[in-house]
Amino acid sequence: MDLITSLQEITKLSHLYYERQWMYATAGNLSTRDGSSRDQFWITASGKHKGELKDTDFVCVSVADGTLLKASDGLKPSAETSIHQVLYSQMPDIGCCLHVHTIDSNLLEFGVGKEEGSREIPIPPIEIIKAFGIWDEKPNLTMPVFYNHTHVPTIADEIKRYFISVGIPKVPFLLIEGHGPTVWGKSIAEANKHLEAVHFLLQVMARKV
């Protein structure tokens, strides 16, 4: 998929997620790896209303170090750009990352401490996890949950440490407590599928609390 088409697809998802109440106002951020240059990615610019996003409301960032490479006048990278940069750098095969602020993901409380940084939380072995390509019967799965530091690069650093020390999660997402999930996939379509499954999973978990 060429870059223009990719940005158009991400823009459509932004409008859809706004309608689903997954990204109110300027909350959330979506990105796609540049298919013609996989060492860079395009992410929604900071301060853009997700229900009114245009396919020109993106900036280009380096996968290697998060350096801003291209941006139209006045556009700045999303606040969570450092998290996307870590995900693309740690997983060279992924092509899309989606971060939203759903109600259920904010209702879930695990009490991850600031000094603790992160914790693996068990997830129920329900049918929807097949959307992640996991077909084992009643698998014993966990999801990484991270403390919601005000300084977002600190969250990104803890995610990187987790990936290096623990490994890539078996499930294609992570959760920032009191904030929202971030999912990834090899393509925009796969990442969207994963996000829909994660939304359902977190709904179930929120109702069990």
From Swiss-Prot:
One BP term from GO: L-methionine salvage from methylthioadenosine
Keyword Metal-binding among UniProt keywords: yes
Superkingdom to which the source organism belongs: Bacteria
GO cellular component: cytoplasm
UniProt: Zn(2+) binding residues: 99, 101
Record-linked Gene3D superfamilies: Class II aldolase/adducin N-terminal domain
Record SUPFAM superfamilies: AraD/HMP-PK domain-like (SSF53639)
Reactions catalysed according to its record: 5-(methylsulfanyl)-D-ribulose 1-phosphate = 5-methylsulfanyl-2,3-dioxopentyl phosphate + H2O
HAMAP family membership: Salvage_MtnB (MF_01677)
Protein name (database record): Methylthioribulose-1-phosphate dehydratase
